[in-house]
Amino acid sequence: MLKRKTVAIKDVYVPVKRRQTLDSNKVEALAESILAKGQEAPILVREDGTRFVLVEGLHRLEACRALGETTVSAYLVQARQH
């Protein structure tokens, strides 16, 4: 079962490859939705030392950041072994 927690946005690292897929129109639409309904779906992160690495939810993360939020709801997932 996934562990849900609130994490500081500043502690979430977004890998460069993932950051390149950012769509500002999606961020804007999600920000409007979050204002109206709150954050309905947590992002997915994995622990990496003292920070969290984003696994899924870039647009949700950036929408929360754009709204001036300092924390985001997240599910903590296990890192995949390669």
List each model region and its residues:
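Short, charged/polar connector segments at secondary-structure boundaries
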Residues: M1-Q78
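Short, charged recognition helix plus adjacent turn
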Residues: Q81-H82
